């Protein structure tokens, strides 16, 4: 049966969009559950924690104890999912998956609006929307971000929709018709929502209104009187401005009441202003001074002496500002977030006045960093790439669909924008106005982001527009349309070349320093030595075999295949540090712990090693001492700060197979529990007792303690500290529930009977519990390698005993 003409015409018209959506869908499905995560990144913990409290009906109170307050829309977006589906990010990821496809479609429609309608059916320009959407669908940052609890996915979708509404207004038959005004109102709503997602968009509302004013003013012509022309231009310009204000105002009222003073959207701007000013003043980027200043206004556990040190050394104190001394005299609990915002702003402005030229210099450096590639950025999930932990497909996708696509698109976008305005200038006035709008959006971000501080994530909202113009340039090149460029376009071409040089050139071409000298600081780039994208990609790929060998070693040790482990170690495929640990573990397992200890270098040499390896070495040495029965020495080995910093609970569970605990008891947080526990946070003291909080999924291991008969398990649990109304604990073995404990609101010992485990085998007990999110103070307390890692707390245990 022949295909109906209407269906055929639809396919002919929309197949490029369908192809782009399919490519985006396939890439995101390939990434589902496969991000090389090592924990939460950037602001994920803050967003998720505040959303959980919001979903529980506690409003935005979580931010009362945080360093700043946050725009509400993204926490609200996450909170809806938590309210409906529980404390899990997976439903959020699914919604963000769909939003990613919406971004592709919006980019397609925006590109269609920027290409002359008469040209789409006849020449190369008809392919611009499809190519733009396809490139955006393959853009790796956006493909990754749908599984990240950051606002980018939602924010970019809203921004694209807002820009599209303005472009549709400009393409309306009449700029002052009812339909045109509806587009302006829609743009106002969308930019208002964007402002409630990220405060940076607030300023662009005024920029967009200015663009509307100029568009109407130029379109009106000089035949009308100045007053009539002004009135006709002001009315449309006021619509998005007023509507956006109406969207933002209710939240401003709520936030101002909740945070004890005027807060327009959030207080992140004040914090970032202080951070940027502090960086300029000190000549170096250090977060600690800014953080300590804010903590002195926030942390109720900080001593008055510490507060006086941090606040007394401020710029405001140096200038005898009475506001800072008044804050010093008040308890931190009485200082509101709005007052902290005022003091952060005042301190930032004070520092700027001290060294204004340094701030200009810092901002220019930030502008360059804004364009540079940062291969190891948190949101790229590439940290530790030299260990080989990244799958080759992820490494190659990052190189091709992130770095390479960006390096090519950036200069091509400038050329494409120039070509668009040159080729369409004769009879497409509104098209030129729309390209001006996009240019204003790009310039607005370039001017505002580096003023405070710039990270690669901040440039992602610009990429959809850059890809549209880059697609135009590529297709124009194929059609030999670059001949339209002339001498008047030389500045644009120079700018394109300069940006290409900045992002792609090796650092040695830019820096005046000798790379071999101590003063040389490597700069990120696309080409050149480390940390360039090309070299780091090679390092990530070439180190994969060593990582796989280390993983095979871990599996051999876990499965008691010591002979296979020795053969692997002798092959030289395992890196030297892991080889040392592996040999020491095998010596201990074969009954020669003294020989294992003798393999380690001296304490002085250990102190010079990588801190993560120091922690693992301490765990192995402590286990060997524990096998010798030297518990005091083992405790001292497990105790160093570096072990606490990394809390290597999971690593010890996977690599060690310790001897049975003395008296059949695991003492949580007592410095001898590593290797026996999984899914527990750092230990903490409480009087004479030590405790550990469990995560939602945890486990206990009693090595070789199976008796072939039922056994008794005793747990000392603190139900009083739980943040849950009805704390509970499910105990299971091999996935089968053994007991369900309803915990009382007190410290209590619970006893239960376990089914028989074969004689001499490990008794592994699984613990499952609902979790709660502690206050923001708990997240602030996570420092060192655990900074930014949200703790989802289950139950608090003192000890576990198996009889």
Predicted regions and their residues:
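Membrane-interface transmembrane helices that cradle and orient dolichyl/undecaprenyl
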Residues: 119-123, 162-186, 194, 212-223, ...
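Transmembrane-helix signature of polytopic, membrane-embedded enzymes
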Residues: 17-20, 107-138, 156-157, 178, ...
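Multi-pass, polyprenyl lipid-linked donor-dependent membrane glycosyltransferases
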Residues: 42, 69, 73, 91-101, ...
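Membrane-interface anchor segments at the N-terminal boundary of transmembrane helices
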Residues: 90-94, 333, 351, 358-438
């Amino acid at each position: 049966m022949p295909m109906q003409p209407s269906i055929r015409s639809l396919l002919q018209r929309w197949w490029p969009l369908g192809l782009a959506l399919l490519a985006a869908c396939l890439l995101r499905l390939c990434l589902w559950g496969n991000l090389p995560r090592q924990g939460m990144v950037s602001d994920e913990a803050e967003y998720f924690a505040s959303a959980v409290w919001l979903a529980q009906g506690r409003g935005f109170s979580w931010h009362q104890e945080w360093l700043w307050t946050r725009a509400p829309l993204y926490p609200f977006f996450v909170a809806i999912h938590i309210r409906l589906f529980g404390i899990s990010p997976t439903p959020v990821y699914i919604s963000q998956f769909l939003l990613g496809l919406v971004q592709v479609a919006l980019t397609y429609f925006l590109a269609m609006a920027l290409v002359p309608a008469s040209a789409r059916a006849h020449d190369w320009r008809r392919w611009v929307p499809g190519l733009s959407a396809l490139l955006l669908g393959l853009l790796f940052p956006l493909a990754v971000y749908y599984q990240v609890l950051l606002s980018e996915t939602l924010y970019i979708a809203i921004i694209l929709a807002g820009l599209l509404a303005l472009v549709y207004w400009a393409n309306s038959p009449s700029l002052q018709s009812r339909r045109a005004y509806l587009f302006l109102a829609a743009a106002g709503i969308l930019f208002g929502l964007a402002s409630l997602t990220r405060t940076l968009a607030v300023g662009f509302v005024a920029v967009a209104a200015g663009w509307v004013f100029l568009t109407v003013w130029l379109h009106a012509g000089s035949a009308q009187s100045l007053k009539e022309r002004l009135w006709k231009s002001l009315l449309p310009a006021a619509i998005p401005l007023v509507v956006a204000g109406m969207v933002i105002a209710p939240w401003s009222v709520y936030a101002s009441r909740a945070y004890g003073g005027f807060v327009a959207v959030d207080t992140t701007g004040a914090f970032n202003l202080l951070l940027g000013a502090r960086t300029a003043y000190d000549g170096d980027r250090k977060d600690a001074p800014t953080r300590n200043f804010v903590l002195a206004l926030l942390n109720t556990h900080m001593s008055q002496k510490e507060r006086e040190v941090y606040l007394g050394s401020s710029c405001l104190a140096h200038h005898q500002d009475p506001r800072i001394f008044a804050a010093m005299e008040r308890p931190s609990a009485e200082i509101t977030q709005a007052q902290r915002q005022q003091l952060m702003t005042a301190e930032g402005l004070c520092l700027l006045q001290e060294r204004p030229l340094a701030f200009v210099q810092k901002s220019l450096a930030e502008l360059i960093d804004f364009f540079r590639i940062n291969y190891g950025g948190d949101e790229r999930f590439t940290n530790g790439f030299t260990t080989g932990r990244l799958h080759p497909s992820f490494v190659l996708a990052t190189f091709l669909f992130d770095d390479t696509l960006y390096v090519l698109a950036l200069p091509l976008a400038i050329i494409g924008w120039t070509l668009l305005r040159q080729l369409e200038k004769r009879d497409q006035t509104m098209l030129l106005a729309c390209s001006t709008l996009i240019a204003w959006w790009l310039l607005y971000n370039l001017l505002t982001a580096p003023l405070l501080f710039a990270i690669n994530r901040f440039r992602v909202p610009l990429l959809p527009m850059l890809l549209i113009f880059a697609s135009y340039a590529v297709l124009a090149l194929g059609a030999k349309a670059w001949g339209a460029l002339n001498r008047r376009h030389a500045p644009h071409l120079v700018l394109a070349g300069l940006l290409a040089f900045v992002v792609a050139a090796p650092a040695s071409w830019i820096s005046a320093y000798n790379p071999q000298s101590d003063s040389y600081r490597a700069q990120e780039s696309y080409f050149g030595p480390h940390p360039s994208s090309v070299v780091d990609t090679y390092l990530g790929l070439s180190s994969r075999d060593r990582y796989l060998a280390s993983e095979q070693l871990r599996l051999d040790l876990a499965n008691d295949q010591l002979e296979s482990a020795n053969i692997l170690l002798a092959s030289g495929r395992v890196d030297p540090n892991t080889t040392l640990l592996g040999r020491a573990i095998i010596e201990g397992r074969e009954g020669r712990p003294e020989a294992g200890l003798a393999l380690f270098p001296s304490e002085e040499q250990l102190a010079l090693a990588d801190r993560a390896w120091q922690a693992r070495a301490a765990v192995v040495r402590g286990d060997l001492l524990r096998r010798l029965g030297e518990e005091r020495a083992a405790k001292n080995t497990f105790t160093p700060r570096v072990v606490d910093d990394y809390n290597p609970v999971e690593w010890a569970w996977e690599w060690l197979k310790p001897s049975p605990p003395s008296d059949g008891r695991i003492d949580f947080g007592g410095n001898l529990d590593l290797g026996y526990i999984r899914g527990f946070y750092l230990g903490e003291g409480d009087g004479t007792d030590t405790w550990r909080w469990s995560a939602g999924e945890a486990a206990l291991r009693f090595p070789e303690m199976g008796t072939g008969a039922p056994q008794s398990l005793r747990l000392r649990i603190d139900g009083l500290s739980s943040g849950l109304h009805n704390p509970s604990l499910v105990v299971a073995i091999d996935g089968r529930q053994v007991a369900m404990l309803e915990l009382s609101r007190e410290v209590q010992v619970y006893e239960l009977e376990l089914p028989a485990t074969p004689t001499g085998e490990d008794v592994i007990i699984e613990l499952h519990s609902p979790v709660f999110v502690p206050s923001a103070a708990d997240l602030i307390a996570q420092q060192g390698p655990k900074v930014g890692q949200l703790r989802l707390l289950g139950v608090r245990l003192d000890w576990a005993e198996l009889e």
